[in-house]
């Protein structure tokens, strides 16, 4: 069903000379680091759209998932949103959320997030009157416990 050549390159454009190419930091890294093209200041409890000045063409049957970097997560920096659709061709922006207690500064060229390519499935949706039952049912949000 998925006829995708995993060795095909993903095409990207540097929109300005401030943009840096996405990079993997090790051969086994799942994500490609994304870099800020500008300086930003994010006060505690605030969020900021960080521009990369990179646009790219996602592989067929894939989307890009923008994920946090573990080092930034330790500082209370998280990601908002985080999906790059297969047909999006604009400047890739990353929403950084400062959950920390101190102002967070982003400098031009800082690694701000990682881009992970994931396969996507486009099912047909069918509205029905009821769903088959399961042992769990509609129990959610902590219903399975911690252990």
From Swiss-Prot:
Its EC number is 3.6.1.23. GO terms for biological process: dUMP biosynthetic process; dUTP catabolic process. Mg(2+) binds at residue 24. Keywords: Early protein, Hydrolase, Magnesium, Metal-binding, Nucleotide metabolism. It comes from the Viruses. It is an enzyme of class 3 (hydrolase). It catalyses: dUTP + H2O = dUMP + diphosphate + H(+). SUPFAM superfamilies: dUTPase-like. DUTP binds at residues 68-70, 82-85, 88, 93, 95, 111. NCBIfam families: dut, PRK00601.1. This enzyme is involved in nucleotide metabolism: it produces dUMP, the immediate precursor of thymidine nucleotides and it decreases the intracellular concentration of dUTP so that uracil cannot be incorporated into DNA. Belongs to the dUTPase family. This is Deoxyuridine 5'-triphosphate nucleotidohydrolase. It comes from Cowpox virus (strain GRI-90 / Grishak). The gene is OPG046.
